[in-house]
Amino acid sequence: MSTKPTIAFTHLGCEKNRIDTEHIIGLLVQAGYEVDANEELADYVVVNTCSFIQAAREESVKTLVELAEANKKIVIAGCMAQHFPEELLAELPEAIALVGTGDYHKIVDVMQRVEKGDRVKEVTAEPTYIADETTPRYRTTSEGVAYVRIAEGCDYRCAFCIIPHLRGKARSRTIESIVVEAQKLADQGVKEIILISQITTNYGIDIYGQPKLADLLEALGKVDIPWIRMHYAYPTGLTPKVITAIQDTPNILPYLDLPLQHSHPEILRAMNRPWQGQVNDDIIKRIKTAMPNAVLRTSFIVGFPGETEEHHSHLVEFVKRHEFDHVGVFTFSPEEGTPAYNLPNQLPQEVMDARRQEIMEVQQSISWQQNQKLVGQLVDVLIEQENPQTGELIGRSPRFSPEVDGLIYVKGEARLGCIVPVMITDADIYDLYGCLISSAA
């Protein structure tokens, strides 16, 4: 019987944080620690926090306070530990350790020191670490899906973004390392991997001297995983070579997540993305011409300091004109330590909320129309869940990425983690409904 303490985990934030959590769990399990989903039964709770914007920090703080009030011993990991180490130690006596974004591979040593009674701060000022295929990992996603981090950190300095401070400079894994990990996941039965980094299209610059995303996609084309999806493709990095690699590699989904942030050149200049304003329309046109079946997701920030009604109207028309498949809209969050924090002409929250709502309503109409086109079509669906009450299956098609896009509700019988043909019979703004064509899956 194990004499090691039991540890529970709470994960907050993005899928990059999720991968960090999975490595933390993997390392602790390898070292003999017990992991329990029940925080009440655990000796320690590791909270992997998010600090990207104010709302994320508030969620992280709420979670930490609730655990502190329950007298839990807390290990704070992730972006808040990186961002506010001294404040957290001062204000939360229950925090017995802090682990920064570049230090989670030291978690076993941290826990051993904690067990001896130490209060530990393991936070490297500028993170440089990136896990690879040799780092233990315990996946927390559904059995058919896995995220694969191809790079970490960011060298861009967008005026609104705190990520370079939280995650460090850009650093990539080798193509060989990523392919080995993908093959391991294929051997485990994974059907979809999602490639992530801060800027996926900049992959490889630091180790190869030039972007190597196209070469990576071609190499991953030899791995037996049916769906490979990319997130965070910076628009100017979608070169003809990358687009050709997507076209020519059958298991690379024509799904592009483009964090455009805005459409108006003046706002993009203020955001320190000056080159983007002149190319947004051209890049989208090039993608749609080369890949008429491409699924486009993007995200925008409304209410950036100085954004006028004219700037906002430009963005609304941009959304109408391009008819994106999926859109996320965020109100500007002033982040201390970023250039945008002290910019003049900050907008009231109610103005930002109204602008966000307007774009969301425009996009909802577009999304509804896009989904209606799929009624009567046969699509491949990766089955991920089963509703225990109704027996209804829940999954996604290539046009839906996990967490951020819609779902497909399926009538029929199939194994979890397999891809099956589904006839779409109905659709709403975000989700699709259908019937399994064959129950032989």
From Swiss-Prot:
Q: Where in the cell is it found?
A: Cytoplasm
Annotated PANTHER family: RIBOSOMAL PROTEIN S12 METHYLTHIOTRANSFERASE RIMO (PTHR43837), RIBOSOMAL PROTEIN US12 METHYLTHIOTRANSFERASE RIMO (PTHR43837:SF1)
- What biological-process GO terms show up in the record? tRNA modification
As for family, the record states: Belongs to the methylthiotransferase family. RimO subfamily.
Listed EC numbers: 2.8.4.4
Q: By its UniProt entry, which NCBIfam families does this protein fall under?
A: 30S ribosomal protein S12 methylthiotransferase RimO (TIGR01125), MiaB/RimO family radical SAM methylthiotransferase (TIGR00089)
- Protein name (record): Ribosomal protein uS12 methylthiotransferase RimO
